[in-house]
Amino acid sequence: MEEWVEKYRPKSLNDVAGHNKTKQALINWIESFVNGQKQKPILLAGPPGSGKTTLAHAIAKDYAFDVIELNASDKRNKDVIAQVVGTAATSKSLTGKRTLIVLDEVDGLSGNDDRGGVAEIIKVLKTAENPVILTANDVYKPALMTLRNNVNLINVGSVHTNSIPPVLRKIALKEGFEIDEKVIKTIASHSGGDLRAAINDLQSLATGGSLEVEDAKELPDRDSEKSIFDAMRIIMKTTHYDIATSATRDVKEDLGTIQEWISENLPKEYLRYKDLAGGYDYLSKSDVFLGRVFKRQYFGLWRYASALMTAGTALAKEEKYRGFTRYGPPTIFTKLSRTKGSRQKMKDILKKIALKTHTSTKRARNTLDYLVVIFESNPEVSAELVEYYELTKLEMEFLTNKTIAKNIFSVIAGKKPKVKTETPKKKEKTKEAMPIIPKRPRISEPPEPLKEVITTIEKSVEKADTKEKEKKDPKKQATLDSFF
């Protein structure tokens, strides 16, 4: 089914609701280009749904410009900007028309996929011959500071609530269905000046077959960031598919956290066992899809998990529950915050075991179960294991208790010889302690080449000693008596 936002997007500035000053500024700007006068690029800044992109496309249509657009769904790194935008900024289109370049949501440029994108945009803007319109929700991001100096900034405010009902009536007329004026005003008041959101809400109610004021009142308020409590109220109270799925659209919580909130508050709202069982059944199915998302890294399954946990639980009840219900945060978050220190101790112990057993911490947990049994039954063996795994006394107390840990460390202390550390006595005046002469270290056998050198030196010394001896003790003269 085609989205009505695209189907009924204004084709001309005259069809755009409100923004009269902005429209006139755009007309003056584009006519300067048509007359050959180069102008600075324009940056349209405003909240989502205020009509920034619509204004850019409408002015292009009015003045017969071809549009080249890069939005948040496109890869917008340095190379892409240079190849696509850089080329289009200085040349005509294939049809011979002038080209209007639209860079949507430039404040969303971030991460590795868009690396160098902002710097390349600034480079392109300085040499652009064709008109360029940029849009942003938050123009005062630090990354856009240099960019702001190279553009003409035009602030686009939210659409006035009074300008929304005529647009909704026009769409209802073209789609061929009747709608109560109270429903239109309720949708407009819930939109918070977001025309796109108002059209989406109208389509949700119309396709769901329910155009009652009561259903329109359950639509989420978009005038500010919606809290998780608002989302809980909508999911638990509504029986409308589209309203339930849109309940978490403006909530700044991940699906895992939202799932915990629903799980915690479901028994508070659903008092009939059949409704409660149905709600948890859909919630468990959403958990399966969330697991597949992370396991397979296939984020296309994300929307199924979201639909099951919101619309699934909302439609599980047979009828709405009246009255006020006090919703609260998941108790698991409180427990996790309380046990943060304990969980960190367990991680440290598992890391030590994993290091010694050359396994992961996940497998080390299985090993730890057996170790605890040994710790509680055999202090002697436990002492050796504690020394091997280098566990501290505090860690042992955490795994067992103080008594068991004390017994094990007593065994460890008994195995090691105690070294008495006495304080040195004062020296007596009459007696002095003899200094202890350290023994000469044993010299190992010298290597073969060194042996030859040592032998040669020893022979030379021996020869010199012999000569010296002969000088001191000369030989006596030999006589015939020595032969007899």
Curated annotation (Swiss-Prot):
Sequence ranges of Basic and acidic residues compositional bias: 419-432, 442-451, 459-478
Top-level taxon of the source organism: Archaea
Keywords: ATP-binding, DNA replication, Nucleotide-binding
CDD domains linked: AAA, HLD_clamp_RFC
Binding positions (ATP): G46, P47, P48, G49, S50, G51, K52, T53
Pfam families the UniProt entry points to: AAA, RCF1-5-like_lid
Disulfide bridge positions per record: none
Family according to the record: Belongs to the activator 1 small subunits family. RfcL subfamily.
Function: Part of the RFC clamp loader complex which loads the PCNA sliding clamp onto DNA.
Assembly notes: Heteromultimer composed of small subunits (RfcS) and large subunits (RfcL).
Protein name: Replication factor C large subunit
